[in-house]
Amino acid sequence: IFVGTVRDDGIEAMEFESFDEVAIKDLETIAEQATEQFSLNSIDIIHRNGLLKVEDTILVIVVGAVHRPEAFEGCRFILEEIKRYVPIWKKDIHTRGEEHWHH
């Protein structure tokens, strides 16, 4: 299980937006790749959109596998692939009032 949260590193909040139609297809593709590559039995991925404050949960990845190494490696693969190409953008809202959008 991986749970990603909004960190308190000068950020007051983060806002997430996604191109849902493409993001869902991309997440399904990533799950299929991870299942094949790491022999995973089950995968659940939840990524939130909208305004999230410090310590709020952004992303949850739950994988099931017969062996721990495959589960951990599969979970990491899923996380890195989400960050690499799923169309989800985030806006950092800094405590100083600055705001920055990025992928």
Model-found features: residue ranges?
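N-terminal, polar/charged subdomain of small-to-medium soluble alpha/beta proteins
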Residues: 1-57, 64-103
